[in-house]
Regions:
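Catalytic histidine-centered segment of alpha/beta-hydrolase-like enzymes
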Residues: 292-304
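Alpha/beta-hydrolase active-site loop signature
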Residues: 64, 89-92, 158, 292-295
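Bacterial N-terminal signal peptides
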Residues: 10-21
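Bacterial N-terminal signal peptides that target proteins for export
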Residues: 1-11
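Flexible "cap/lid" subdomain of the alpha/beta-hydrolase fold that forms the substrate-access gate
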Residues: 26-44, 49-56, 84, 91-128, ...
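Structural cue for short, hydrophobic secondary-structure segments
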Residues: 59-62, 85
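Serine-hydrolase catalytic-loop signature spanning alpha/beta hydrolases and amidase-signature enzymes
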Residues: 64-72, 83
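Active-site glycine-rich loops that stabilize anionic/oxyanionic intermediates
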Residues: 62-65, 131
Length: 316
């Protein structure tokens, strides 16, 4: 096992060096480009890379991030895949209507991304889900199982055993009674200290994490009125665990190829949540990395290599 990890790390390092050597010769299709689309009257920002006739890979971000979290992953995949990374409403560079103007629920986020993909002409695709990306992505998968070619879950939970004590500490009381006292507790999750903790806790070398990551996310959280958006989604998250059984049924019946690559030191989603995918799909690939919640920040090259190997075996 140690030898396997050594060779995987060496391959990831070589892959990173190879990317650097061709940076100046990068083709237009491999370059990440930046766009907006009008979806149901909202401006949806998205990043795009790779040939449009290549297999599609849709990257679905978590909280409190945006497509910014995929900025280094996309060029590592775009020679072989058409990669799309949208920002949800209320996140990143997409529009942020008030909760009175847009219902901030995971059903509605999935509706918006579904309509975005229809508009882009994306009929078949693989999904990469992280954190909030999981309830969005699994809604898409259960609505349109014929469209999903593969699932990559990076700390994107779909099992009760994946929920760490964090959920009981901050959210269960709020779900039961969203009064001002319980709301104030949840509001602590919108501070810079909390955002930094998500990025740095469980990392081997926190000094390798660029402060651009958590400061970019925090700037979004501190926009006027954004706290109301996030509180609405925190409250709606209570509707996700009751859907887990239907997601498991989808995995058992439709059998999409699954790659679970998780930071095993995540304070929010436990490794047991990654291991549980093997229960519903014994063929699923599992890789537990010695890092945290935002695993791309520390192990992006290795994750890219695992994705390339996984999709190369499963997508034709």
């Amino acid at each position: 096992m140690k030898l396997q990890k050594f060779f995987r790390a060496a391959a990831a390092a070589a892959f990173t060096l190879a990317l650097g050597s061709v940076a100046f010769a990068q083709t237009d299709t491999r370059r990440v480009t930046y766009h907006t689309a009008s979806v149901d009257g909202l401006k949806i920002f998205y990043r795009e890379a790779g040939p449009k006739d290549a297999p599609n890979l849709v990257l679905l971000h978590g909280f409190p991030s945006s497509s910014h979290m995929f900025r280094e992953l996309m060029p590592r995949l775009s020679d072989k895949y058409h990669v799309l990374a949208p920002d949800y409403p209320g996140f990143g560079y997409s529009d942020s209507p008030t909760p009175e103007q847009y219902a901030y629920t995971f059903d509605h986020l999935a509706d918006t991304i579904d309509h975005f993909l229809d508009q882009q002409g994306v009929k078949k695709y693989s999904i990469y889900v992280q954190d909030y990306g999981s309830p969005v992505g699994f809604r898409l998968a259960t609505r349109h199982p014929e469209r999903i070619q593969a699932i990559i879950t990076q700390n994107g939970n779909a099992y009760d055993e994946g929920l760490s004590p964090f959920w009981a500490e901050y959210l269960y009381a709020y779900w039961n009674d969203p009064n001002s006292t319980n709301e104030a507790k949840v509001h602590q999750l919108l501070t810079l200290d909390s955002t930094k903790l998500q990025y740095l806790q469980g990392f081997r070398a926190p000094e390798n994490v660029s402060p651009d990551s958590y400061n970019f996310d925090q700037a979004g959280l501190e926009r006027p009125g954004n706290d109301r958006i996030q509180l609405a989604l925190f409250y709606d998250y209570r509707k996700n665990p009751p859907l887990y059984a239907s997601w498991h049924q989808y995995l058992c019946e439709k059998k999409p190829p699954v790659l679970a690559v998780w930071g095993k030191n995540d304070p929010i989603f436990l490794p047991a949540g990654a291991e549980a995918f093997l229960r519903d799909d014994p063929r699923a690939e599992l890789h537990l990395l010695n890092t945290g919640h935002f695993a791309l920040e520390e192990d992006g090259a290795e994750i890219a290599l695992l994705i390339r190997e996984f999709l190369g075996k499963n997508i034709r």
